[in-house]
């Protein structure tokens, strides 16, 4: 959510952000509703003053006729106030709805575009493997190495669920421990977060839980949702608090993630790439306004360190305006090389990191005191450390060998306890 004074003072900038994101939003309607809301509040104040004056007169020693007149006036004022308060409630509801739809402004260096083709490639890192044999995709490897079972999961839970088996279980746990240890070494406080959040927290982070395109599951007959990312629960940790930001507060959260992924059934979404449930380690930071861009770049650097140590080839993208979620001021993606992607190999997203400035903290009322003792809204930065399913794809497909097995990246061996997954007949 943006500051309304900022919107009024920077109307053209806000409109350009809306247009660049491909959104349809009438910002002038928001201004109209705000003006109307203020006028109603003023009228209510005036009527309350008249009502108080009328009540004061009634306490005086009056003749019967004048007292009856004041009683009737009091009834009229009461009815007018009720009508105005009901109108204020309706207008405020519409105002809040429109206000929440306004996206964050864009960083000046965000590429303007209308598809993922307009994302700007910053760099490529690592050597794409060349095989002397026909490489398998992760589904074939998962079958031949007895690591994955989608068929039984489909019977038990439905499509886009899966069982991890045997070495894949230890590989997932190794990835979690590897990333959490790295983040702890870098000064992050480590959490296992709830997998459930209340609606006002989900909404405050910038997800639209009631929208037609909502990607998260609601728990029936409650105000709670299964989280699609621990960004939600980490971001809500300091809801309605004034926090000490002498130093940035860096948090690392492990959680399960649940997503509907409606309609995601194409070739590029097969197997583990797009599923209803997966495990993830998330980075999160609360910081001062002047620190968020630095923290954002730091998060990207940590992500690069992780995938460099995992020896996975990747590329870094500066995400274009059309692909940004409403809270994001700027976003980087890292895409890993996946030899089995689309039958010929390609890059697929494995992490992202977003600087959301004070967009989320305004909704969640998370503040800090600046050097002058004034309350300011904290800036909030998030980023994926490890989303296990997609990293497992990358490891299986990049580290397969001619024997049909898969080597384990050296940085993970101390966590897995083995350095090779053999072919199983």
From Swiss-Prot:
<comment type="pathway">
    <text>Aminoacyl-tRNA biosynthesis; selenocysteinyl-tRNA(Sec) biosynthesis; L-seryl-tRNA(Sec) from L-serine and tRNA(Sec): step 1/1.</text>
</comment>
<dbReference type="GO" id="GO:0005737">
    <property type="term" value="C:cytoplasm"/>
</dbReference>
<keyword id="KW-0547">Nucleotide-binding</keyword>
<dbReference type="InterPro" id="IPR006195">
    <property type="entry name" value="aa-tRNA-synth_II"/>
</dbReference>
<dbReference type="InterPro" id="IPR010978">
    <property type="entry name" value="tRNA-bd_arm"/>
</dbReference>
<dbReference type="InterPro" id="IPR002317">
    <property type="entry name" value="Ser-tRNA-ligase_type_1"/>
</dbReference>
<feature type="binding site">
    <location>
        <position position="275"/>
    </location>
    <ligand>
        <name>ATP</name>
    </ligand>
</feature>
<dbReference type="InterPro" id="IPR042103">
    <property type="entry name" value="SerRS_1_N_sf"/>
</dbReference>
<keyword id="KW-0963">Cytoplasm</keyword>
<dbReference type="Pfam" id="PF02403">
    <property type="entry name" value="Seryl_tRNA_N"/>
</dbReference>
<dbReference type="InterPro" id="IPR033729">
    <property type="entry name" value="SerRS_core"/>
</dbReference>
<dbReference type="Pfam" id="PF00587">
    <property type="entry name" value="tRNA-synt_2b"/>
</dbReference>
<dbReference type="GO" id="GO:0006434">
    <property type="term" value="P:seryl-tRNA aminoacylation"/>
</dbReference>
<dbReference type="GO" id="GO:0004828">
    <property type="term" value="F:serine-tRNA ligase activity"/>
</dbReference>
<dbReference type="GO" id="GO:0016260">
    <property type="term" value="P:selenocysteine biosynthetic process"/>
</dbReference>
<dbReference type="GO" id="GO:0005524">
    <property type="term" value="F:ATP binding"/>
</dbReference>
<feature type="binding site">
    <location>
        <position position="384"/>
    </location>
    <ligand>
        <name>L-serine</name>
    </ligand>
</feature>
<comment type="similarity">
    <text>Belongs to the class-II aminoacyl-tRNA synthetase family. Type-1 seryl-tRNA synthetase subfamily.</text>
</comment>
<feature type="binding site">
    <location>
        <begin position="349"/>
        <end position="352"/>
    </location>
    <ligand>
        <name>ATP</name>
    </ligand>
</feature>
<dbReference type="InterPro" id="IPR002314">
    <property type="entry name" value="aa-tRNA-synt_IIb"/>
</dbReference>
<comment type="subunit">
    <text>Homodimer. The tRNA molecule binds across the dimer.</text>
</comment>
<keyword id="KW-0436">Ligase</keyword>
<dbReference type="InterPro" id="IPR015866">
    <property type="entry name" value="Ser-tRNA-synth_1_N"/>
</dbReference>
<protein>
    <recommendedName>
        <fullName>Serine--tRNA ligase</fullName>
        <ecNumber>6.1.1.11</ecNumber>
    </recommendedName>
</protein>
<feature type="binding site">
    <location>
        <begin position="229"/>
        <end position="231"/>
    </location>
    <ligand>
        <name>L-serine</name>
    </ligand>
</feature>
<comment type="function">
    <text>Catalyzes the attachment of serine to tRNA(Ser). Is also able to aminoacylate tRNA(Sec) with serine, to form the misacylated tRNA L-seryl-tRNA(Sec), which will be further converted into selenocysteinyl-tRNA(Sec).</text>
</comment>
<feature type="binding site">
    <location>
        <begin position="259"/>
        <end position="261"/>
    </location>
    <ligand>
        <name>ATP</name>
    </ligand>
</feature>
<feature type="binding site">
    <location>
        <position position="282"/>
    </location>
    <ligand>
        <name>L-serine</name>
    </ligand>
</feature>
<keyword id="KW-0030">Aminoacyl-tRNA synthetase</keyword>
<dbReference type="InterPro" id="IPR045864">
    <property type="entry name" value="aa-tRNA-synth_II/BPL/LPL"/>
</dbReference>
<keyword id="KW-0067">ATP-binding</keyword>
<keyword id="KW-0648">Protein biosynthesis</keyword>
């Amino acid at each position: 959510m943006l500051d309304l004074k900022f919107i009024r003072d920077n109307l053209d900038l806000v409109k350009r952000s809306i247009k660049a994101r491909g959104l349809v939003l009438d910002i002038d309607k928001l201004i109209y509703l705000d003006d109307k809301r203020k006028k109603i509040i003023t009228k209510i104040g005036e009527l309350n003053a008249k009502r108080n004056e009328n009540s004061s007169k009634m306490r005086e020693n009056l003749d019967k006729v004048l007292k009856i007149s004041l009683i009737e006036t009091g009834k009229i004022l009461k009815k007018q106030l009720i009508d105005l308060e009901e109108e204020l409630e309706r207008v405020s509801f519409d105002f809040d709805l429109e206000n929440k739809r306004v996206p964050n402004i864009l960083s000046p260096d965000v590429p303007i575009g209308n598809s993922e083709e307009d994302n700007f490639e910053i760099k490529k890192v690592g050597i794409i493997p060349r095989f002397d044999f026909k490489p398998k995709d992760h589904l074939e490897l998962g079958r031949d190495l007895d690591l994955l079972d989608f068929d039984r999961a489909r019977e038990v839970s439905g499509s886009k669920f899966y069982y991890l088996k045997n070495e894949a279980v230890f590989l997932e746990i190794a990835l979690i421990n590897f990333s959490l240890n790295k983040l702890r070494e870098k000064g992050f406080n480590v959490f296992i977060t709830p997998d459930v959040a209340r609606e006002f927290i989900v909404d405050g982070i910038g997800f639209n839980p009631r929208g037609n395109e909502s990607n998260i599951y609601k728990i029936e007959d409650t105000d709670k949702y299964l989280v699609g990312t621990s960004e939600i629960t980490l971001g809500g940790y300091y809801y309605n608090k004034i926090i000490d930001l002498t130093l940035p507060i860096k948090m690392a959260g492990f959680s399960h993630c649940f997503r509907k992924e409606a309609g995601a059934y194409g070739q590029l979404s097969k197997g583990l790439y797009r599923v209803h449930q997966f495990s993830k380690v998330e980075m999160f930071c609360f910081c001062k306004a002047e620190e968020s861009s630095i923290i954002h770049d730091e998060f990207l650097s940590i992500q690069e360190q992780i995938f460099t140590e995992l020896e996975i080839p990747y590329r870094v993208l500066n995400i274009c305006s059309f692909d940004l979620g409403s809270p994001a001021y700027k976003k980087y993606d890292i895409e890993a090389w996946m030899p089995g992607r689309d039958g010929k190999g390609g890059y697929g997203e494995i992490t992202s990191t977003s600087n959301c400035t004070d967009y989320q903290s305004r909704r969640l009322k998370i503040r800090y005191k600046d050097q002058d003792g004034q309350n300011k809204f904290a800036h909030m930065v998030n980023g994926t450390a490890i989303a296990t399913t997609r990293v497992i794809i990358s490891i299986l497909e990049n580290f397969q060998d001619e024997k049909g097995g898969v080597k384990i990246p050296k940085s993970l061996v101390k966590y897995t306890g083995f350095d090779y997954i053999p072919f199983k007949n």
